[in-house]
């Protein structure tokens, strides 16, 4: 090949158009960017679990609002049906749990597997005494009780309250019933001791207390005016005097000066202010369904409350509506439904 031919070939090569790059390359780059964006968006939007799937104990079945506190699983966005409320799903078993459960001769207590029961002696303050070292109570309720006794001892300058009974398991209640029956007869045992499984003491929310002075004098609260403080102030801590003489035909229990039960502050206030026993209050709340008029009132701190009832489904889960904002409590009634108590802003 001579030089002329070489020059000609070189000129032809230099005139050739460069190979066109594939038109698919920019598309693949664009698709890659879109995929990365969608993956990041999916991570952001995926719901994160709260660690609690129901109204189980630990917060006394108190669930709070959107400020980071625990709430049961959401089964519907806020405002889908009722503006200002959102739906959660509760199982039928949840009816048997909460501060307002009614336990009496008609409604048996369902023992939970995760009850937080603690010894009173190991967790009490110096403001009161205990009759026996093995007495127990629900841990959360004991903390509230300690606060109440601290105020009482500060106001009255008395430390003569003695706790005589607290939480009882099934066997303990069985033993007490049998003991009272042998000592005082079956009629007495039937009147003052509930059958095993039907006692409020199973809840860990109830306790019996009286007066026991340093001089060894024992008496009930009604015998000393100082101790009637509990009749008129315990509701500010969420406790009620459970069995009053004039309610015996409803509760089925004769007057008990010593028996107090925790139900929660707003409920205790309303029951105290309107002279209602727990049976009456549970019945009253059924007349305030969620989709109807709600019960509204102000407590002694001028906080406005709304209460409403949602019947439990006979089968499967129940859709319960709770406020999307503000604090609220949620409880089963151990009978047929759920009760919501919500703090409400004044209009």
Where do the protein language model's features map onto the residues?
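Extracytoplasmic cell-surface/polysaccharide-interacting catalytic and binding patches
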Residues: 2-166, 170-347
């Amino acid at each position: 090949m001579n030089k002329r031919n070489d020059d000609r070939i070189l000129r032809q090569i230099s005139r050739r158009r460069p190979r066109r790059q594939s038109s698919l390359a920019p598309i693949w780059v664009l698709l890659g960017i879109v995929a990365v964006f969608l993956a990041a968006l999916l991570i952001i939007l995926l719901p994160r679990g709260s660690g609690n799937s129901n109204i189980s104990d630990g917060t006394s079945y108190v669930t709070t609002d959107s400020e980071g506190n625990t709430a049961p699983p959401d089964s519907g966005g806020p405002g889908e049906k009722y503006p200002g409320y959102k739906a959660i799903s509760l199982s039928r078993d949840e009816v048997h749990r909460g501060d307002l459960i009614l336990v009496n001769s008609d409604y048996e207590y369902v023992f939970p597997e995760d009850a937080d029961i603690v010894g009173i002696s190991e967790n009490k303050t110096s403001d009161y005494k205990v009759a026996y070292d093995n007495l127990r109570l629900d841990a959360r309720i004991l903390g509230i009780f300690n606060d109440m006794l601290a105020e009482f001892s500060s106001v009255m300058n008395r430390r003569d309250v003695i706790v005589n009974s607290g939480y009882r398991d099934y066997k303990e209640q069985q033993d007490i019933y049998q003991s009272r029956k042998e000592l005082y007869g079956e009629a007495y045992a039937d009147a003052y001791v509930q059958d095993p499984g039907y006692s409020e003491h199973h809840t860990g929310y109830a306790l019996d207390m009286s007066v026991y002075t340093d001089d060894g004098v024992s008496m009930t609260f009604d015998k000393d005016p100082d101790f009637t403080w509990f009749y008129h102030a315990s509701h500010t801590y969420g406790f009620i005097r459970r069995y009053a003489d004039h309610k015996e035909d409803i509760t089925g229990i004769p007057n008990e000066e010593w028996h107090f039960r925790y139900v929660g502050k707003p409920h205790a206030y309303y029951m105290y202010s309107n002279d209602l026993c727990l049976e009456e209050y549970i019945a009253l709340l059924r007349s305030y369904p969620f989709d109807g008029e709600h019960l509204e009132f102000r407590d002694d701190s001028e906080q406005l409350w709304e209460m409403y009832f949602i019947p439990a489904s006979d089968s499967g889960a129940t859709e319960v509506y709770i406020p999307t904002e503000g604090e609220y409590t949620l409880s089963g009634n151990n009978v047929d439904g759920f009760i919501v108590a919500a703090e409400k802003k004044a209009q």
